[in-house]
Amino acid sequence: MARRRLGLALVAALALLSPGAIAAEGVVAPSFWDPGRKPEKPDLAAIKQIRFLTEDDFPPFDFALPDGSIAGFNVDLARAICEELEFSSCTIQRRRWDLIVPALEDGSGDAAIASLKITDAAREKLDFTAPYYTTPGRFAVRKDSVLAAATPAALEERTIAVQADSAHEAFLKTFFPKSKLATFPTAQAARTALKEGRAHALFGDAIALSFWLNGQDAGDCCMFRDGPFADPGYFGDGVGIAVKKSNIALRRALDYALARVAQKGVYAELYLKYFPIGPY
């Protein structure tokens, strides 16, 4: 997923919202784990510590607070994992984005919970847990739109704003061949085109769109239309926690903890806290 910088003021406000209040608005947390499968606790004897690595400028996943500490969905999830594994030696350290993978490789960090996408290229260097979120594509339209659906038939001969040379553009070319594509150099420019009425619909990253729709930049102009498109051939296999290739014990421990955190409802609480307009 492209690294989009969303408004910190919005994220800080989200952090103060209660999960119950958000859930009441109908947002449903996704599930990436089989609720009927009881995870088997692995042997944790070989794991002496977990040094989580993340960044601090990719809200709502990780961001710096005024007091210098870090917060966000990734940060809270790391804390929940530490609590589930009952590790006293468990830290969350910030790194610049381009230094996170090198830190795993040189052993100065143990696990990267920094929105790293699971790709074939990444798997050559790192091991990943099962995905803890995905990055599907989704359509948005203006609130005064007459479009009742976001289907190839409904969008035939309609203009769709999309970022140029992106997976989203490639997807549209394949599955919406009769639509008119208005391409833009950035996702922000494509969003502005929809807001200003220069396109009938917008197609882009669902997570980024969810925060744009809820933020000041959108000006309450727009809304999602229909559900997400999660074709892994275009949008990847999701995002996981990365560990050094040889650290099998830690990967198994993290997978176990993620499944347990999900079963206990903690994952859903965190999701509802940070995603007031569900991207899925």
Predicted regions and their residues:
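Extracytoplasmic small-molecule ligand-binding "clamshell" domains
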Residues: 24-115, 124
